[in-house]
């Protein structure tokens, strides 16, 4: 914004969390508006109405405000951890989230501000797990099975053939909607991306099983 104010040829792009994005509609209307918000992991930038002074500054110096989802933000935090070895809070990672999501793309060199590292360790743990799931590298499956010997071994064999790595298994005979002769197999599985994840599910389905992905 300072470079833009100095008259340099700079395009400034703001980013908000999709669940609490007051600026796009406010800028379109030419005045601060109050919008309905829903919870977001980027609570540091969650505002229902822009302040009058920030709105005036952003209206003058920012070219565009784009939005990103919480899934986008989780993927950005995970990417920063893995590639840059940086711990960045959700509100501070929205710029990277926008680039990874293809929002507000610039035609030349692009700089992103990482504006904070204040993230609770437990939230970081959840965000990393969510980021892995959102990028297709981790999933939890529930599979109803006939209660007879060999079923667990068969599922394990199929997952091995598909190249998936099982990291946790829960086998239970108790669950809503289960028949007396059924069990539920729940597996936490590492995969290599969305295509591999879809392939793993397809291999199980082609073998006659009915896997269900358990969302976070």
Where on the chain are the PLM-derived regions?
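Glycine-rich phosphate/pyrophosphate-binding loop at beta-loop-alpha junctions
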Residues: 1-60, 97-146, 156
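Beta-strand->loop->alpha-helix junctions that form or flank phosphate-binding loops
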Residues: 14-16, 67-69, 88-89, 167-174, ...
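Catalytic cores of large soluble enzymes that bind and process phosphate-bearing ligands
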Residues: 15, 46, 50, 65-72, ...
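Short low-complexity, flexible loop/linker segments enriched in glycine and/or proline
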Residues: 28-29, 82-83, 182-185
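Active-site-adjacent helical/loop segments in soluble small-molecule enzymes
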Residues: 51-108
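A conserved regulatory-domain signal marking ACT and ACT-like small-molecule sensing domains
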Residues: 121-216
């Amino acid at each position: 914004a300072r470079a833009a104010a100095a008259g340099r040829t700079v395009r400034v792009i703001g980013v908000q969390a999709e669940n609490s994005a007051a600026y796009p509609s406010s800028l379109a209307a030419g005045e601060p508006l109050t919008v309905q918000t829903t919870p977001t992991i980027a609570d540091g930038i969650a505002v229902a109405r822009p302040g009058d002074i920030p709105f005036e500054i952003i209206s003058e110096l920012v070219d565009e405000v784009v939005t990103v989802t919480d899934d986008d933000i989780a993927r950005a935090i995970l990417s920063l951890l893995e590639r840059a070895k940086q711990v960045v809070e959700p509100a501070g990672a929205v710029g990277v989230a926008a680039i990874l999501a293809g929002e507000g793309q610039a035609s030349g060199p692009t700089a992103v501000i990482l504006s904070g590292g204040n993230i609770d360790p437990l939230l970081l743990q959840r965000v990393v797990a969510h980021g892995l799931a959102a990028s297709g590298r981790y999933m939890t499956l529930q599979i109803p099975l006939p209660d007879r010997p060999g079923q667990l071994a068969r599922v394990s064999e199929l997952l091995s053939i598909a190249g998936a790595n099982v990291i946790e298994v829960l086998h239970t005979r108790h669950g809503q909607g289960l028949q007396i002769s059924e069990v539920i197999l729940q597996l936490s599985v590492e995969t290599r991306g969305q295509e591999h994840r879809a392939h793993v599910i397809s291999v199980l389905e082609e073998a006659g099983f009915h896997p269900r992905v358990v969302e976070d």
